[in-house]
Amino acid sequence: MGQTVTTPLSLTLEHWEDVQRIASNQSVDVKKRRWVTFCSAEWPTFGVGWPQDGTFNLDIILQVKSKVFSPGPHGHPDQVPYIVTWEAIAYEPPPWVKPFVSPKLSPSPTAPILPSGPSTQPPPRSALYPALTPSIKPRPSKPQVLSDNGGPLIDLLSEDPPPYGGQGLSSSDGDGDREEATSTSEIPAPSPIVSRLRGKRDPPAADSTTSRAFPLRLGGNGQLQYWPFSSSDLYNWKNNNPSFSEDPGKLTALIESVLTTHQPTWDDCQQLLGTLLTGEEKQRVLLEARKAVRGNDGRPTQLPNEVDAAFPLERPDWDYTTQRGRNHLVLYRQLLLAGLQNAGRSPTNLAKVKGITQGPNESPSAFLERLKEAYRRYTPYDPEDPGQETNVSMSFIWQSAPDIGRKLERLEDLKSKTLGDLVREAERIFNKRETPEEREERVRRETEEKEERRRAEEEQKEKERDRRRHREMSKLLATVVSGQRQDRQGGERRRPQLDKDQCAYCKEKGHWAKDCPKKPRGPRGPRPQTSLLTLDD
């Protein structure tokens, strides 16, 4: 017990039945292998501080949730059931989780108390802030911070925080005490962008995925109120994300999220760019944004007056209280995003695209997002363009994991498959992959079978060598025996060897056969004729 470390991830795996029950209560289904993959490999890459061992910190969980629920190609719909289950476990922790969750102040169960009665001027509630009502009691001892152009923008730091039912802050405390008190009892928001909102907030809704803090919103007197970026926001964004040169896509997605959720002013945009980009990167982004300005005919224009009107480099005198001023600001943000996207494109390098391969435990959806990002970064092609779907599909097949790629190549009627069909088929193959235990068992079984086949082949070869050796020995023995027999038979017919002075006729020594006295002398007689038998005989 003392030598094992319990982590949120290991704790959920030990109580997996409870996790599945909680997921079922959320009307979702979760798998253990993907639960581990998302917690240890996917979510730590979101740059929101998610540890590989998991966490029950509701603030971090909601930040991951905002990434998962992001619209468009930056979202992760396949991870929704898992982050929703994490959130449910952290929001209402079961008994085995409570020792690992820090106590939190319970928010007021009732909605914020709004002024009621026949008041002639009830403070309106902003549609963007359904849980907030602006203060109606200004503090005259604090001077208001007005904008340079004399507009109605005011600093909410000089006002009392919005009233909340059941909880309030003493008006005798200073601004610093009020900020410190609210920060300690603040409920985590569903986005990493939380520190711009001063004062107490209601707990986020279950389906909330974006921050409710905006630099510009309607106040109690019907005028826009300005809340600037806090230094902690800028610090966290800069340190928790890669540089623009290193990963322009990720930083562009962050700035796009900030522009969408915070509605920053022109000054806020300059502060944001100056913090997150280097001087050279900022100049490149501004240049590309000005190139994206379109004229009245809808085509890109280079007329200085039109470019300066749409995307000014100097502080404009836009009146944000008017619809015209807000329209200018919306167009400026759109051009700024276009500049970020165009400036983030590197020179065409298809080798970089081909170098993007699926990781061993990477889901096909995550791999496809990395592949599309490589297309956007290293090629002039838009991977979302229907005309490029074939190229992206082929890259997806060839650069997938080997087991997935082989099965995708063998699909029937592959040419008619869309990219979505390929991704769904790849997800099915990915989810049916064998577990590490099954893979280990299969490798062990294959090794044993291979060893048995090798031994059988060795035994067969040894037997063949023995048979061949036996045949050769048999032939050799037969040859030896036959030679010995022939030697014995030939030895009987051979004449004995004679000495140098021995007679071949009488075998006596001292003379040769031609001088042998025992040899008959005289002419040879005719040979007797051999009578031949005839038919008459």
From Swiss-Prot:
The modification Phosphoserine is found at residue 191. GO terms for biological process: viral budding via host ESCRT complex. RNA-binding phosphoprotein p12 is phosphorylated on serine residues. InterPro entries: G_retro_matrix, G_retro_matrix_sf, Gag_p12, Gag_P30, Retrov_capsid_N, Retroviral_Gag-Pol_poly, Retrovr_matrix, Znf_CCHC. A lipid is attached at residue 2 (N-myristoyl glycine). GO terms for cellular component: host cell plasma membrane; host multivesicular body; membrane; viral nucleocapsid. A motif (PPXY motif) lies at residues 161-164. Residues 107-217, 434-537 are annotated as: Disordered. Residues 437-478 form a coiled coil. GO terms for molecular function: RNA binding; structural constituent of virion; zinc ion binding. The keyword Coiled coil applies. Residues 429-434 are annotated as: Interaction with host UBE2I. Keywords: Capsid protein, Coiled coil, Host cell membrane, Host cytoplasm, Host endosome, Host membrane, Host-virus interaction, Lipoprotein, Membrane, Metal-binding, Myristate, Phosphoprotein, RNA-binding, Ubl conjugation, Viral budding, Viral budding via the host ESCRT complexes, Viral matrix protein, Viral nucleoprotein, Viral release from host cell, Virion, Zinc, Zinc-finger. It comes from the Viruses. The record marks 129-130, 214-215, 477-478 as: Cleavage. A motif (PTAP/PSAP motif) lies at residues 109-112. Residues 434-465, 485-518 have a biased composition (Basic and acidic residues). PROSITE patterns: ZF_CCHC (PS50158). A zinc finger (CCHC-type) spans 501-518. The keyword Lipid biosynthesis does not apply. A motif (LYPX(n)L motif) lies at residues 128-132. Residues 344-392 are annotated as: Interaction with host PIAS4. This is Gag polyprotein. It comes from AKV murine leukemia virus. The gene is gag.
